[in-house]
Amino acid sequence: MEQHIVESLNLDDYLFRSYSEGERVVTLYIGYYYTADKVGAAHSPLVCFPGQGWEISTPKAASVTTAGSRVSAEQIMIRKGQQRELILYWFQAYDRTSPGTLKQKLNNFWAKLRSKPEDNAFVRVSVTIQGNHVEDAAKSAETFIQAFYPAFFDYVTNQQSS
């Protein structure tokens, strides 16, 4: 990402990468923060996408069950011209996920009470919607999260306090 974006988001670290299988492409973005002071530094896609000219659907709650965990997320569809994407996103505070920053703050406080690291993150999984195949895009996002999240969870929960 461009340096001014990294600075604007006050990121400590990030990952922005696309993965493909056949014609399906899944894009993963993780904005990572080392301290609780930065909880809320990441903002919801409901803020940034309209500012970039995207139309967004009404968010709906989403839940993805993975090996040993459940990811509580928000799902939206965005459109700009003919391009449409399905997005699942959540905020991570130690071992808990939430679709919004208020619950992220509560989860981070709970982690602190348990003497866990203050690391937190914003995670976004995007899949281009091809034709009218919204369900296919949603399934691709869910399958990706099921494969990706256990490794991410392990990374987040095994960090030493910063």
Go through each PLM region and give its residues.
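Solvent-exposed beta-strand/loop surfaces of large extracellular or lumenal domains
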Residues: 1-8
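A cross-kingdom signal targeting lumenal/periplasmic-facing segments of multi-pass membrane
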Residues: 10-160
